[in-house]
Structure formats: structure tokens, C-alpha cells
């Protein structure tokens, strides 16, 4: 299965190169057709509850100098990817940016430019960057709980790991590639997943043994979650019907972490169905919690208030719950961290707060 994925990716890239060659062979100015990935071509699919690319297409042509440079960079990148697949190597996105220093006129001016080109190739081919042997700098999440996975290590050996019994307090680190050829989910002994924004709160729940008392899988998101984290959660939800609850701070940016997990992000709209878990439930801090528990707070910044107002028209936050909580947060002009619950002691979050919220959802 692994080789088939990589062979398919190579064929897709070779088809692009052949098309450019054939255009040049006929004396035409070469061009590529690519999906438009601007905000105007991204729609929220109410049917699937995820962000999706629209049908608008654009052209990258050598007619202008900048377009010619981008086509040259594209060809260099495709060659680099093919070489990695042949050599059974992989590269970080950062390494690929520096590799381009040897491409003379085709070198990238910024890493953002090289990252976007890799995303364009994903959108054009329907392949994933994992199929291209490209990986991000950041690690995936830490997880702890009663699930058993089988991971293929760098030597090609299969290793079975129980993510509760075979790991230390820091948990199991999710690799950048969590597809079935790399990672198999062998057994699931948890009732639900709880995705936690901050490391401090993840450690609190681990120390309090919440994974065992609630029979859950704890996942540390590390802020905005990495793609591998979202994909890992999606696989558990889709393949094993494990519900997802998201526990974050109470501010507009944390609300967007929930939205990214549940409905996808605009930037990766072309793969939202592959990453998003639309059935996710929110159990994070709300404006109502701030008032009901009299939590320590900070004042909203102008940026916070602007982001909250934008969320009122964001289709990911439709429904009375989000409308009420966002409007209330704007009204009280306050935000709070999830660790503010420590006001009531170190056990309050696991003895009272989460059991109450999860109980309302029928998860505990």
C-alpha cells in the first residue's frame, strides 16, 4: 500500500511535467491550470459541514516573468519530490526551502512561497504532502489513553504500543504521517477523545488520572493543531466511531481551534473532508462559565473583539449556542484561560467542571 501511494504521487507529478513538455514541444507558451485557493473560492458546505474549495480555476503561465519563474520552481520541486520517493527519503518543508538555494533562478524568496507551492501541488494532484514525503517542522500532539496502535518505525519494523500502559507521563507522540501504511489502530478501549488546548491543562488531566476515570483519550493540541493531529483524531472518529470533545481557553482564537478541528480551516479547505471532524462537541471555557464560576479574567483586546464579531457571521459558529456565548463575551468584555479553573483547586476541573459538561453530552 505504501509503495502504491508514492507511485501514484509520482505519476501525478509526471503527468504535470509531460503536459508542460508537450505544450513547449508544440511551440506554445507553457501554463498550468490550478484551483484558485483565495478566500473568494472557498465555500462552507452545509451538507458536509466543512470548508471546501469552489470550482474556480486559474492559470500559471510563462507568458510573464513571474509566472515563468513559478513554473520553473514547480518543475524543480516535482523533481525533488520524485528523487526523495526513489531514495526513500523525506524532507521538512524548511529543508525544501533551503534546497531551492541550488536552483539558481528558481530559488524561493521566502519559505511561505515554497509552502504555498507544495499546497498547490496537493490541490492539483489530489495527493497529500505525506505522499510527497514532505513533513512540517512541528511535531504532532501528545496523547495518552487506552488505545493500541501499531507503528512502522524508521527501520521498517512494526511496533505495537498501548498509549496508556506503554508510555510515560508525556504520552505517545503522534508522527507526521498517520496513514494506515505507517500507523494502524489495533484496538480502542476509550469512550471518547478530549482534545486539550494547553500543555498545562493536559498535564493536569494526566496527573489527575482523568484518562482512566473518564475512560477517555487525552490529546494535547499544542494550540492550533498540526495536520497529523487532526488526521489522527479524524481516523479514530471515522473508523472507530469515537466521539470528540474539545476543551480550550475561552477566547475567540480558542473558538477557532475548535472550528478548525470540527469544520476545517480556510487554508486547507481542499482537504477538509480528510482532516475535519464535524461531530466534535465544545466543552471549553465560555462566557457563561466566566460568570457562573466567577473565573479570573483578562480584558478583551481590540483584536479579540474584532475576531468575535467576525465569528458571528462565520458559518462554523452558526446556532444559538455560539451566538449567545459570543455576544455575551462581547458584552462582558472578558476572556479566561482554562487553567483559571484552578481557582477552585487542582482537582476541580476533573471532579466537577469536565464531568458536568461531558455528562450533559452523554459522554460520562
Feature locations, PLM:
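Nucleic-acid enzyme cleavage-core boundary/entry regions
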Residues: 1-243, 252-364
